[in-house]
Amino acid sequence: MFREILQKTQTELYDYLIDKLKEKGYDNIITTAGKYEFIASKGTIPIVLVAHLDTVFKEGNRSQMLIYHDSEQGVWWSPNGLGADDRAGVYMILQILEQTNLRPHILFTTDEESKATGASAVCGKKQELFGDISYIIELDRQGYRECVFYECDNPEFEKFIEGFGFTTQSGTFTDISIICPDWEVAGVNLSVGYIYEHSRIEHFYEAMWKDTYKKVVKMLETKCDRVWKYIPKEYDTQSDIYEKLMKIYNNSQKEKKSNGKGSKC
């Protein structure tokens, strides 16, 4: 299934996912008529799983792209640019639906890499799409066992997420950077096993992905009736803002040295 997901254009994947959700019992699927912006469907668990459908690479004829898979090492790569950012997140959501009876709320977005079309389109629509929710999990972070909260400053929520085996890191942007403050619900972005994203040497590691998969299943199995509130970070002085910008800059320089291309989220 992962190869099939990698080889689809965003539009092809959009249509494919609607059919997949229907197969798994999601009968109330909401999209924007005539537009490829988002796919939303309400489940029975009040946690929203989010992944985006686009990649940074020119789509062309992705069905003909070269994909290499070392099955012994569990590593995937492509000279065309793999696009595991964020097809790895899409794959994880589908595998949860395939391998378990868990049915969380689902949100697939489009154009996260360019103009955040999908994330912007769901602003103001929380009640319409899902009603009350506990928190949001985006599956769009590079690496292994990392969690990112962006501008959400809820220490209790951070501790709750770290309790599943993740370590907090800083990040710059993904869909929940827009969605969480608009919906006033806390959210987290979790590692899904790709590295060197946004480059032709992007690699995807199955072992890293499986580790997060197991943790997300545990999170969905953990009964949580409370609503985790989005608490915005406050920057009271120019020095606070400068400190934040320097932290982001320094982290990006470290990632460039280690990854060759830096990291977006």
Predicted ranges, named:
Residues 30-31, 41-103:
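Active-site metal-coordination/substrate-binding segment of hydrolases
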Residues 80-161, 168:
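Acidic/histidine-rich catalytic neighborhood of metal-dependent amide-processing enzymes
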Residues 23-32, 67-70, 164-168:
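Short secondary-structure junctions
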